[in-house]
Amino acid sequence: MNQQLAICLGAALSIVMSTAVKSRAVDEWPQFRGPQADGHADSTKIPLNWRETENVAWKTEVPGTGHSSPVISGDQIWVTSAVEVKLSADEEKERLAAIKNSRGLEIAGSISLRAICFSRTSGKLLHDIELVKVDEPEPIHSLNSYASPTPILENGRLYCHFGTYGTVAVDTKSGKIIWTNAEHHVDHQNGPGASPAIWRNNLVINFDGIDTQYVAAIDKRDGKTIWQTKRSGKMNERVEFQKCYCTSAIIEDKDRGSQVISPGADWVYSYDPASGKELWKASYGTLGFSTVPLPVFGNGLVFVSTSFIRPRLLAVRYDGTEAKDGSLVEWQMDGQLPQKPSMLLIDDELYFVTDKGIGMCLDARTGSEHWKERVEGNYSASPLYANGRIYLFSQEGTTVVVNASKQFEKVAESTLDGGFMASPAVAGDALFVRTDTHLYRIEEK
């Protein structure tokens, strides 16, 4: 074989391999917010418009209740759900009366926490597996569910997490439980929220209750705890201001190494994912509790949004170097910020929608505002970026599409029968959305 032919074949093989890798990435949505946990989808053909009778390939009812997002691999789509045995109105009133600060809470008599699998092609139910049965569960907030954490799908295993009720690994082919870890218990006050993050063999999970606050790594192979690190930052003395519901972000940096970026109450922390050693922490200031949005990162900065009472957005240097004021915080802003939806970082712009429907675009390097506009609805689900556009999914069931640019431009609006609490997923050129009652496959017809 001559050198020129070898070069041509090598280039062709490189293109084929690159295409194959990209196809696998596009075809799977293995965790909360996608392959890179950033809300970005590679598809260029997701529809701009749909309704119950337009661009819906299938629609199937999901048993029980849950806010976990769909995760996808091959022909399988998995969600978690809680099938509740309701209390009577008098029983619920009596149970809640015994709880301090029970405003906004609701409670079930018992719950069956389940992993449910559907065919990506047809929407047919493939598995419905009880993972955990709980009698007399803790109360949850009316905006939460007992199955809010999104599972992780990897190499034929599904890793489901339910906060204080445990973590379970499932064989996706047989539907059999491989292991269960039920040793981590916290008082969430409002129910579970943090999804697991994965780093090599470690499932990294935040446990931030009103009684104890720590981060743990569970071995994905056997379910044993590898490390557990207590939060070190000083917090508000009131226990209800010590809780959090945030998922950790994993940063892989060839120069700086791997980090777990883990928001807790009043502080955002960085940990070594192998050992759990704290690397650095940065303060939000006071009342930085109940944090929900998953951090996003890029250009040496990680963006963290705290949640209730006094929302604050911080751009933190994740290499541990100090900014001009001697802190790790490059810039920060207060005011109208997302309390539940996560943000999108697209090149040098940071996009988000607040719970009350205020959309914003900022310069990610400086925090300066490009635009701020009201969009329809209330929001809990995190936005999606695909093909130059941002999709916003409201609790009322409306999806607003805007261009990802420094000027605000609304492109489309669509509505389905149910509301969105779960964030979307994409596989191939299809969009998968979970409403409060159904799972949909949406694609161009």
Locate the predicted segments by residue.
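Bacterial N-terminal signal peptides that target proteins for export
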Residues: 1-9
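Bacterial N-terminal signal peptides
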Residues: 8-18
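Noncatalytic, solvent-exposed loop/strand surfaces
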Residues: 21-445
